[in-house]
Amino acid sequence: MGRRAKMVEKVKTLMETHEQIRNMGICAHIDHGKTTLSDNLLAGAGMISKELAGDQLALDFDEEEAARGITIYAANVSMVHEYSGKEYLINLIDTPGHVDFGGDVTRAMRAIDGAVVVCCAVEGVMPQTETVLRQALKEKVKPVLFINKVDRLINELKLTPEELQGRFMKIIAEVNKLIEKMAPEEFKKEWLCDVANGKVAFGSAYNNWAISVPYMQRSGISFKDIIDYCEQENQKELAEKAPLHEVVLDMSIKHLPNPLTAQKYRIPNIWKGDAESTIGKSMVACDPNGPLAGVVTKIIVDKHAGAISACRLFSGRIKQGDDLYLVGSKQKARAQQVSIFMGAERVQVPSISAGNICALTGLREATAGETVCSPSEILEPGFESLSHTSEPVITVAIEAKNTKDLPKLIEILRQIAREDNTVRVEINEETGEHLISGMGELHIEVITNTKIGRDGGIEVDVGEPIVVYRETIMGTSPEIEGKSPNKHNKLYMIAEPMEESVYAAYVEGKLHDEDYKKKTTADGEARLVEAGLEKDQAKKVMSIYNGNMIVNMTRGIVQLDEARELIIEGFKEGVRNGPLAAEKVQGVKIRLVDATFHEDAIHRGPAQIIPAVRFGVRDAVAQAKPVLLEPMQSVYINTPQDYMGDGMKEINNRRGQILDMEQEGDMSIIKSSVPVAEMFGFAGAIRGATQGRCLWSVEFSGFERVPNELQPKIAKQIRDRKGLKSE
C-alpha cells in the first residue's frame, strides 16, 4: 500500500474522532505566501514531494492560477499529522488573497473553525490581512499567526536580532489590535495571539522552516542562530532542524479548536433556529447520529463528474445514495458520490459524519451557501446567508461570437452564478446582451477568459468595463399616491432615508433580505430594534430588499393582508431602478401610510396592485432628493520616499483623497480613497510613476455620493448607455 493510500485509510478512521479533527484555513493578503505554506504543509504530511514544494503550488491546480501565480479559488485537502503521540486529521483550505476573489474567502470561513493568518514580515499587516481577519472573526473562526518571509528581513534588510524582534512585536501588536476590535465579545482576550504560549510562528514558507517560542525552548535554537543560518545561505539545514510543517501544524492542533468545541459557539452565530430543538442540540453537540445538517461552501465544476459541492457537515451523516433536501432552492437531491478532497483529486468514501468537510456530487441545483438536510427532517430556517465585505463594482456585456453557442453560454453563466455568489449575471432584455458584474477587473477577466473561454470553449466578445453605480435619497418625499391602472386601488406612501445604523447593520450582514409573511418575526423584530429602528416600526416591516425596506404603518385595512405579497413585489420592482439613471436604489425606507382597495378581489389582482406600488415607490424616491452613489476603493501604496510625490500625484489625478501617510525606514505608506471609475489602468500608471518600485493594493470600501458637479454628467452618460431618454 503506497503512502497516499495509507493516508486515505487513516483519514477514514480519524473522521469519526471529533477531538482529533481540525478544520482550518490559511488566509492572508495577496502574495504573503499562503499557497507556498499550504504546499509545504502537504509535503511534510507526505502528500506531495518535498523537492517540489514551494515551487509546485499543489493547491493552485487550475491552469489560470499557475499562470498568474496567484490563488483564485479556495482549494481543499485532507491530511494527517502526528502531535504528542496522537494522529490528527487536518482538513485544510487555502484561500485567495486577491481582493477580487474575496467571495471564496467568505465561503471558506463558513467551513472552518480555525485559521492560520499569514503575514509577510517585510510588508506587515496589509488591507486584505484586515479583511480576511474580519471575515474569520465574524464567522467565529479562531486565528493563529504565521509571520512569513523572515529570511528577507535578514538577507535583504540586514536586521539585527533586536530589530527582528521589534519588527515581529509591531506586527503582532497590529494583529492583536484588530482581534480586540473585531473579535466576538467573549473571545476578545482569549483569542489574542500570544508569542509566549506559541500562538505565533515565524519562518520562511519558501525555504521550508519555521520557529515558535515553545519550539525554540524545546530545540535550543535562538534568533541569533536563525540569522546565522540565513546569512550563511544554509536554510536547508535550518529546515531540517525546524521543519515548517511540524511547527505550524503543532501550533494549529494545540491552539485551534476541534469541531466539538467550535460548534458550541459557532452554531448560534450561523443558525437562528430554535436552539432547544432536536436538530439545534444535535448541531451544537456535533452529533453524527443526529438529523442531517450541512452547508455547501463551494461549487467546483469537474469536466467528468459535473458540479461537485464542497460541504461542511454540522450534524448527522451522509452516505452514498442518500436522499437530501436543499433548503434555499426547495429541491430534493441525491448524494451520488461522497468523497474527501485531496487537492485536485477526490477519494470516494462510504460515508461522511458531522464535523468534517466533504465533496458531494448529485446536488445539481445547489449554490454556495445552500443548506443541506434530510427530506424527512427539514432544517428551518436554513443557515444564515453568507455576507461579503465587497460588492460587484464592475460590469461587462458579453455576447457569443457564434449564435449557435448561445444555449451553452446561458448554461455556463447559470453555473458560474451558482458557483460564485459574488458574481451577478443578468440578461439585458432589449439588447440580448448578457451582463456580468464582478469584484474587479481580474475577477471579470478570469470569468470571461477562463470559465467561458477555456473551460467552456466559447468565444465571446467582451464589452468595455462599466462601473456599477447606486442611487439613494437625501430627503423625505411628500405623501405620494400610487394608483392602479383601473383607478380602483390607491396606496399612499412616503420615502425617507433609512436610519444610518439600520443600513450599517444590513451592510455588515446583521440584517438581510427577507419578506415577512404576516408580521415581522420575533427574531427579525429584535434585530431591527437592536440596529436602531423604532419598536413601533420594527413590528411592521413587510420586506427588506437590496438595502431598502417597506413598513406598513396603516391601521385596520382588511384587504391589505390579502394584497401583502403583491405590495412587496411592487416595492421590489420600484427600488430595482432609480429615477436618475435606472441604477439600483439603496438605503431607502418606504412608509405605507394609507390605502383604499376595490371590494371585489378580481379588481385588485397582481396586474393592478404591483404597478400601483411600483409607480408609487418610484415617484416617492424621485421626490425625495435622489442622488447618485459611486463605488470607492481604499488604495494603499508602499513606495520608496523618492517616489512618494509621484504616488500622491497619481492618486490626486484620479479624484482620490489621501487619508493617511506613514514613514517606515526609507519607505512611505500612502493610504487613500479613490472612485472605482477612476481606477482603470491604475496598475500600469503607478508602476510607471514609481519605476516599478512600489507595492500597492486595493479594497472595496463602500459607496459614496458622487460630487454634485458630476451628478448630471454621470447620470446622462449612464442613461445614454442604457438607451433611456434624457431627463
From Swiss-Prot:
Known function: Catalyzes the GTP-dependent ribosomal translocation step during translation elongation. During this step, the ribosome changes from the pre-translocational (PRE) to the post-translocational (POST) state as the newly formed A-site-bound peptidyl-tRNA and P-site-bound deacylated tRNA move to the P and E sites, respectively. Catalyzes the coordinated movement of the two tRNA molecules, the mRNA and conformational changes in the ribosome.
One example of the protein's molecular function in GO is: translation elongation factor activity
The UniProt similarity line reads: Belongs to the TRAFAC class translation factor GTPase superfamily. Classic translation factor GTPase family. EF-G/EF-2 subfamily.
Q: Which SMART domains match?
A: EFG_C (SM00838), EFG_IV (SM00889)
Where it sits in the cell: the answer is: Cytoplasm
Binding-site list for GTP: 28-35, 94-98, 148-151
Keyword annotations from UniProtKB, A to Z: Cytoplasm, Elongation factor, GTP-binding, Nucleotide-binding, Protein biosynthesis
Name of the protein in its database record: Elongation factor 2
Name positions with the PTM Diphthamide. 603
Return the Pfam families for the record.
EF-G_D2 (PF22042), EFG_C (PF00679), EFG_III (PF14492), EFG_IV (PF03764), GTP_EFTU (PF00009)
Which Gene Ontology cellular component annotation is one that this UniProt entry carries? cytosol
Provide the primary localization: cytoplasm
Residues covered by the tr-type G domain: 19-260
